[in-house]
Amino acid sequence: MGNYTIKIAKGLENNSDAKIIRENVFIHEQGFENEFDDIDAAAVHCVVYDGGYPIATGRLYEKDGAAFLGRIAVLKAYRGKSIGSIIISELEKYAAENGFGECMLSAQCRVKGFYEKLGYTAFGDEYKDEYCPHIMMKKVLSKPA
């Protein structure tokens, strides 16, 4: 693993760096149109930096009393280096420390295996978000030490 810095902040504090990554990955690379939403203002954002440069992001938010992970994105040059796993681990830790017993997420079906390796289990039927097939997944969290 490289010498990365991780920043977690609630609300808009991390949004400018998170937006750079999300625009690059979800809009320019994957072609999504509706990337930003009202959830961003209240979500907890995790951003990973390499030498001060934002390279990956993810968010955690509460919906109907449950913790949801979302918008997990790693710049192409940094994929395959366990950075996505770092983001998820940090957000799961934050969720557990704040009383949540499980995390849920909406995964693009093409990366379902990545989440399964991290302990997530798919449930429900596949559905499309814009043009892309997705599946709901969940994981029971370990209690914080």
Predicted regions, residues:
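A conserved beta-turn-beta hairpin within the catalytic core of GNAT-like acetyltransferases
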Residues: 62-70, 79-80, 129-134
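Conserved acetyl-CoA-binding loop-helix of GNAT-fold acetyltransferases
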Residues: 74, 80-93
